[in-house]
A protein has these predicted regions:
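RNA-contacting regions in translation and RNA-metabolism proteins
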Residues: 1-218
Length: 218
């Protein structure tokens, strides 16, 4: 959805959302928790938003709530930019997003796991595009948010290793497959990269894969 800023109410932003060709715009609320830290919300500015909720309000009718921080917005943006996703040859398997990090010293970041239905299609390359053209469109819309696109794998060890990109992993030990607990060995020079600033990289990798990940020096 494309939404336009029309006014400010307390900490929320009221936006006008296009409801289709020839139809009037409808109002939607963008709550504070769903805003992005790098957005500049000013009157008549337009943004891509994700429709998060429609609730019935007594005497007011349906109330729309939209989000800029929801992982669904990232999916929506990639679907718009990547023809292979639209055609079904590439699919988004999982998304882990930290749009509002707990500390200001850490920027927003998202990890996206992708897979291809057709063997000859490179799903990561399709999402990144020639010279990064496709992913750059998504990054621009999210005001510079860092996005890691990684290859999904049925092999949990390979999937965990991929999820820690851009760090280089030497070995993944699935110490408790039933409890989804893994130890990951990385070279000493890759340790800080694998963990990420204030633990952001490993935190997102854990959320993406569903595994508890302990990182150790090899």
């Amino acid at each position: 959805l494309t939404a336009r800023v029309i006014r400010f109410e307390r900490q929320s932003i009221i936006m006008a959302v296009s409801s289709g060709l020839g139809r009037p715009e409808v109002e939607a609320e963008l709550p504070r928790r769903d805003q992005l830290p790098n957005d500049n919300y000013r009157a008549n500015a337009t943004f891509k938003v994700f429709l998060k909720e429609v609730s019935e309000v007594p005497r007011r009718g349906p109330q729309l709530f939209v989000s800029r921080s929801n992982a669904g917005l990232v999916v929506y943006l990639f679907e718009n930019e990547v023809p292979e996703i639209q055609e079904g040859s590439v699919r988004i398997v999982a998304v882990a997003r930290e749009a509002n990090p707990p500390s200001r010293s850490v920027g927003p970041r998202t990890k996206v796991a992708v897979d291809s239905i057709e063997r000859e299609v490179d799903p990561v390359g399709a999402c990144i595009g020639a010279r990064g053209s496709r992913i750059q469109q998504v990054v621009n819309e999210l005001r510079g948010e860092k996005i890691d696109v990684i290859r999904w794998s049925q092999d949990p060890g390979q999937y965990i290793a991929n999820s820690l990109s851009p760090a280089r992993v030497e070995m993944v030990r699935l110490v408790d497959p039933a409890g989804q607990h893994a130890h990951v060995l990385v070279p000493p020079d890759q340790l800080s990269l694998a963990i990420g600033r204030e633990g952001q990289n490993v935190r997102l990798a854990a959320r993406l894969t569903g595994w508890k990940i302990d990182i150790k020096n090899s």
